[in-house]
Structure formats: C-alpha cells, structure tokens
C-alpha cells in the first residue's frame, strides 16, 4: 500500500535516506525543536500546548477578512452541531488559554509553543495543509526592549540551528489613528486605478485595504511601488518607539531593513511588524514573522494587555538548512548487541538493560543473522557500535566492540568494555 496520505501532509520518519526527502528525517526535526526549547528556556519563556481543535469563534478574532478565516480553515460541525476548527495559527489559541486560566495569568506572560497548524492552502512547494510552527507570545508588557528581546531570541534560534544570510525586515503600522489616516490616503491612491488591479486586490480594496500591499500578483506590483508609505503617517511618539527598537537591533548586531510595504496576513497586528528572511542575491523569502498585537486580548474579552509575538514555519527552516548545505547533526551513537544464537539471548537482554542504566543507548538484534549480514545491516542503519555475543564470549566474558564509524575495534573484560562505551558516548 502506498500514496494513501491526503494531499498536503507528510510523515516525519526516522529512516529517511533519500536526499529529496531528507528534510523529513525525524532526528533532524528533533534537533531543530530542541534548539527552540533550549533558547526559549534561556530567555525565560515557558511552553504551552493548546488543543488541536477549538470553537470556531476563537479563530474568527484573527480577522474576518483575513485569508485564514475566509478560505483556509478546516471547520466542521460535531455531532451536536457545534462549529469547531482545527488550529490554523497559535496566537488566538494562546490568548484564549490565558483568559480561560485568568486566575493564573501574570502581568508578564512569556509563552512559547511548537505545534502543528492546519490550513487548507493551495498545493505548492513548501506549503502544507498540516505544518509545524514554533511560536512565541509575550503578553503584558509594551516596551521597545521587550520587542528587541523577542527579536534577539528569534535571531539566536536561527543561529543555533545554523541558518545563514538572515535579515529582519521591519515596518510600523501604528495604532488606530495612524491606520485611519493611512487607510484614507491608501484608498484614495488605489481608487483611481482600481480596475487595473488584480481581482484579489479589488476584493481587498473593499474588505482589507492594507493587504493589497501584500499582493504577489504581477499586475499589482507597479501600483504597490508607487503607493504612499505608512511611515509618513506615523506620529512622533510611535516613531520614537520604532526608532528605539531599531537602535537596539543595531546594538545587538542583528541586520535589519525597513520595508514600508510589509504587512502581515492577520488583522490583529498593530505597530511593529516584521519578517525574518533569508537573502539570496536579489531575492529573499520569509522563514518567520510576527509583530505587536496590543488590542487582541481586549477584543477576545480580556483586559487591555499589550503583546508581541512571532511564528516560524519549521518545514521551511529545515528545508532551507539543507539547501544551504548546513552541517547535519548526527544521531546518538548506539550499541547493537548481536547474539549469535538463542543461547546468548538471555545474556544480551540482561546486559542491554544494564548498559542503558549506564547511559549507553543499546539495542539487540534478535534475528540471529549471519555475521556478514548483521554487519551490513548495522552499517546501512548507521549503528555506532556492534558487539557479537556467542558461546566464546559467554564463557570467557571477553568482548570485542567494533566502532562502525572509525572501522576500529576495542576489546576487554565486560566491565572494561562498559567503561569504554560510557566514555565514547559521553565524548561523542
């Protein structure tokens, strides 16, 4: 049986060797996820795990005119007719969780997650209907240094996994007054050429004007380039905030570029927005993004609380790492015990358990293969060490361990071999 998965989903699998699908290797995923956990812990952020599905109304708050709500969600009715939606993004779910646990909510909530998201997106390279997101939400504090701190965390994550040629592109959308002034200017600008815009941008003109700037349609690009810049409509107080964040990025050595056409696909963003991109020649593509959303908590029924966050698509991160030729992590070196016949089975079972208690990852090949076949299988499966156990080893308690990567062997009494294995594992 093959090819039975629905479109847009994939397995993260431990035995992937095909170079085309190497990005699906589970150890590679585990390494990237571990880096995210480690960096978040260093910055004092705590993990949250929200349900895979929630009431549909939870996600309507991201904006009724956003692409997610209009056409990308997996929504269904349960057996009692209640509308439920598979989680399409993390921020609304985190805000809902904080409000549900309001008695435990802090003045400064520092939350992160690594979770699958679900969107019914058009099939194309790098886009999946179930994708995995590393996200972070800092809810409760509005300060330029908080924004810079979150961007620093994201930058440290990219550095930890080995991404190169990264840049932060930033824009400032301002608050309600700024947006109102800018919307008026933008509407006036696009109105005179409305019939020349793409069908999608004509729809956005009436429903979500700012998203025209996010259009990728060829017929829109010349108009977008000539459109007014929102930075010309930001008041002095907001501009000082923006400048303070940029000054701190400069201190941190994080390369950035002001992109006045940058908008985000969700309606809740205010003030600072950004995308983290990898730059290749004259082209760039996003590996993450986010911004400030100071009104969403109140819109969700909670108190007025400022917030700043981001989301990173792990599929794109891992694929880009491979495209950039990053040094791939190696799996922990395991020992494979190979009993030569049934008489050695009980000993291997007991010894494997003891070795695991010592911290040596150990498995047993119970198939009683011929030595040549067993060695070939171990090599193909990238096993670190191999030890055959037969009648002679059982009687003398002397063992030979083959290092499969160095093509060398070491031998000795059982306790000596154990000490050497512990050393090799700890110093791998």
From Swiss-Prot:
Major location (coarse): cytoplasm
Q: Which top EC class is named for this enzyme in its record?
A: ligase
Q: Which gene encodes it?
A: hisS
Top-level lineage group: Bacteria
Q: Which Pfam families match?
A: HGTP_anticodon, tRNA-synt_His
CDD domains, per database record: HisRS-like_core
Q: Which residues form the signal peptide?
A: none
Share what the entry says about its subunit structure, partners included. Homodimer.
Q: Which family does it belong to?
A: Belongs to the class-II aminoacyl-tRNA synthetase family.
In Swiss-Prot or TrEMBL terms, this protein is called Histidine--tRNA ligase
Name one molecular function that GO assigns to this entry: ATP binding
User: What reaction is this protein's catalytic activity?
Assistant: tRNA(His) + L-histidine + ATP = L-histidyl-tRNA(His) + AMP + diphosphate + H(+)
Compartments reported by the entry? Cytoplasm
GO biological process annotations for this chain's record?
histidyl-tRNA aminoacylation
**Enzyme Commission number(s) of this protein:** 6.1.1.21
What is the species listed in this Swiss-Prot or TrEMBL entry?
A: Chlamydia muridarum (strain MoPn / Nigg)
What keywords is this UniProt entry annotated with?
Aminoacyl-tRNA synthetase, ATP-binding, Cytoplasm, Ligase, Nucleotide-binding, Protein biosynthesis
Which chain positions lie within coiled-coil regions? Answer: none
Looking at the UniProt record for this protein, which Gene Ontology cellular component terms does it annotate, in alphabetical order?
cytoplasm
